[in-house]
Amino acid sequence: MCASRGDEKRAKSLRDSGEPARVSSVDTVPFWRPTAAWFPATAWFGMATRVGGVSAGPYASLNLSLGVGDDEAAVRENRRRLRAAAQVPEGGPVMLHQVHGRTIVGADEGGRDADGFVVSPGDPWVAVSAADCAPVALVAEDGSAGALVHCGWRGARDGIGPAAIERLGERGIRAERIVAAIGPCLHACCFPIGPEVAAEFDPAFLLPHPTGQPSLDLPGAIAAALAAAGVPAARIEMAEECTASDPARFFSHRRDRGLTGRHWALLHLAPRP
């Protein structure tokens, strides 16, 4: 876990929510999952850690990407284990061709150039891939609609979180009725950035780094954008885990200079009676 300017607000949010976020096992695959009492029980959101698979070397052990140089048979076994653990039907989850943008599509539009889904109860399971970027789930408090987005610094700059809120608004969900969870990602302790990127962000989310460069508080910036768009700040849960500073549990593209695996973060809304 890394310190950042958002830690005090993050800690208060977690205290208000009850139990702090944690990594817990589903069968043999550990997932980070939100634990706030206000997160709808009918919404399944979680990010797999790197533990519980069969891949070796820099991909050990639950790499889920076929595009990073890992053995194909190992990746397919890892995906089978993840589906079995989370009870995702064969053939799922629906995925995207992620492009670090702000486009959000429906669960029936898998494979498109996009970085988020908007879903309804009973839609197929959806997932985004990450290894430092933040997976963010936004769900109506009654579980009637939800969104899952992949958000790195470009997504934070371009407002993919508020874009998801707009898409939920098209379904009649007011922002004040949305709850959110931001999964493990790169934190300010490990996210030095150059002046060009720093200029894109409010100085409130830029912290000093030992390199002398400013460092980005990515989850803090995401949470602030959601709150500014109307999501109650007390109902935004942020993972304390930093992917780069926890090599035992998380892949990190930045820490490992690109030679690493990928996590999946999943979202599913249970069918309504």
Per-range role (PLM):
Residues 2-273:
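Active-site microenvironment for binding and transforming phosphate-containing groups
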